[in-house]
Swiss-Prot record:
<comment type="pathway">
    <text>Carbohydrate degradation; pentose phosphate pathway; D-glyceraldehyde 3-phosphate and beta-D-fructose 6-phosphate from D-ribose 5-phosphate and D-xylulose 5-phosphate (non-oxidative stage): step 2/3.</text>
</comment>
<keyword id="KW-0808">Transferase</keyword>
<dbReference type="Pfam" id="PF00923">
    <property type="entry name" value="TAL_FSA"/>
</dbReference>
<dbReference type="GO" id="GO:0005975">
    <property type="term" value="P:carbohydrate metabolic process"/>
</dbReference>
<dbReference type="InterPro" id="IPR004730">
    <property type="entry name" value="Transaldolase_1"/>
</dbReference>
<dbReference type="GO" id="GO:0005737">
    <property type="term" value="C:cytoplasm"/>
</dbReference>
<protein>
    <recommendedName>
        <fullName>Transaldolase</fullName>
        <ecNumber>2.2.1.2</ecNumber>
    </recommendedName>
</protein>
<feature type="active site" description="Schiff-base intermediate with substrate">
    <location>
        <position position="132"/>
    </location>
</feature>
<dbReference type="InterPro" id="IPR013785">
    <property type="entry name" value="Aldolase_TIM"/>
</dbReference>
<comment type="function">
    <text>Transaldolase is important for the balance of metabolites in the pentose-phosphate pathway.</text>
</comment>
<dbReference type="GO" id="GO:0006098">
    <property type="term" value="P:pentose-phosphate shunt"/>
</dbReference>
<keyword id="KW-0570">Pentose shunt</keyword>
<dbReference type="GO" id="GO:0004801">
    <property type="term" value="F:transaldolase activity"/>
</dbReference>
<dbReference type="InterPro" id="IPR001585">
    <property type="entry name" value="TAL/FSA"/>
</dbReference>
<dbReference type="InterPro" id="IPR018225">
    <property type="entry name" value="Transaldolase_AS"/>
</dbReference>
<keyword id="KW-0963">Cytoplasm</keyword>
<comment type="subunit">
    <text>Homodimer.</text>
</comment>
Amino acid sequence: MSSQFEQLKLLSVLVCDTGDPELVKSSGSQDATTNPSLILKVAQEPKYQEMLTEAIAWGIRQNGDDVQTLTFVLDKIQVNFGLEILKCIPGRVSLEIDARLSFNTEAMVQRAIFLSELFVASGGDKKRLLVKIPGTWEGIQAVEILEKQGISCNVTLIFNLIQAIAAAKAKATLISPFVGRIYDWWIAAYGDEGYSIDTDPGVASVSNIYTYYKKFDIPTQIMAASFRSKEQVLALAGCDLLTVSPKLLDELKKDQSSVTKKLDVAEAKKLDVQPVELTESVFRFLMNEDAMATEKLAEGIRIFSGDTQILEAAVTEFIKQIAAQDA
């Protein structure tokens, strides 16, 4: 029998979740996702110094002030890693805008346009880029604007059905509901007694979103993310896409147990699901009612913002070193 990895590829598009191009290459996945946290882990490794140095030199050549230069460099780093990753896969890569813009629609639109244009100017195919936008109300409004301009968006940090519904209304290309972080919250809040893979709250959340989307023929793709175990991945076999860490992908490759399809369009259409009438007030109220979604969205933004600041600090030091050498 073939590996679980090969079996799963017949049911879902597998995506490698890492900032390391070499790991993407060995993963055998279709697409790849990354973020400031993942890029931070690999950007300072000696084997990637050339990409980092080139991004810094390019940013300095734009002749902006210190803040602008840092912005240029950070986006160029993402683009460089994204383009390197695309050499290793046939599909798309997701790159993320600065999480500190999460509550400013106009700023997110401007940054996403800049990132997309830089990606194309650096030799990338626009059709192979997904721009990651946080699932705040403001972020989802930015997505609606960007999709109309031909910029495909991946709405990330999805923890609640209402976020998914709002993203669908904005005609987002794709959403990323976070399985593991939902599970983490419930374990921290109520302990781990009584949870099995069949009652895993993260798995249940994605299953509910899948049912809603397929019931109403919503074209926005669902890419389940943030897995804590191989079992969580397998519990969502049949989801449009699954973005999985290299470690868990390796576990799937080593196991030849049979894989069963868990999510199915025909079955979803049979279920009794009522459409939700979306307004901003409904969105904000339902998010407020969901302590888990509210807390994990806020935490996710803080984590990505913090990692961006750490990456900024490292880049600032590199810029100083280059300036000192040129002095």
